[in-house]
Amino acid sequence: MKENIHPQYRTVIFHDTSVDAYFKVGSTIQTDKTIEYEGQRYPYVTLDVSSQSHPFYTGKQKTHSQEGNVARFNKRFGRFVN
């Protein structure tokens, strides 16, 4: 079996900058940045979106109503359909 072919698995701090949330997770991601968190130094990765900020997970997603489009279509073209 080959030696030293697996990536290093370590604890990493992920920072969701949009909501200022920090996550301490095991990962193999490579980064040169570090941060002090809870009194220890960890590798640091910034995120734009995570489960703390994504609309699907926060319940703030917008659903588009098709009722207005259908009503507008029927108003314009309903007289032609019979």
Curated annotation (Swiss-Prot):
SUPFAM superfamilies for the chain: L28p-like
Which Gene Ontology cellular component annotation is one that this UniProt entry carries? Answer: ribonucleoprotein complex
MF terms (GO), sorted A to Z = structural constituent of ribosome
The UniProt entry, under Pfam families, shows: Ribosomal_L31
- Quick one: a GO biological-process term for this protein? translation
- Indicate yes or no for the key word Ribosomal protein: yes
Q: Which residues form a coiled coil?
A: none
Query: Per its UniProt record, what InterPro entries does this chain match?
Result: Ribosomal_bL28/bL31-like_sf (IPR034704), Ribosomal_bL31 (IPR002150), Ribosomal_bL31_B (IPR027493), Ribosomal_bL31_sf (IPR042105)
Keywords, A to Z, come to: Ribonucleoprotein, Ribosomal protein
Q: How does it assemble?
A: Part of the 50S ribosomal subunit.
HAMAP family membership: Ribosomal_bL31_2 (MF_00502)
Entry's family note: Belongs to the bacterial ribosomal protein bL31 family. Type B subfamily.
PANTHER family, per database record: 50S RIBOSOMAL PROTEIN L31, CHLOROPLASTIC, LARGE RIBOSOMAL SUBUNIT PROTEIN BL31C
* Protein name, as recorded: Large ribosomal subunit protein bL31B
Question: Could you tell me which species this protein originates from?
Answer: Proteus mirabilis (strain HI4320)
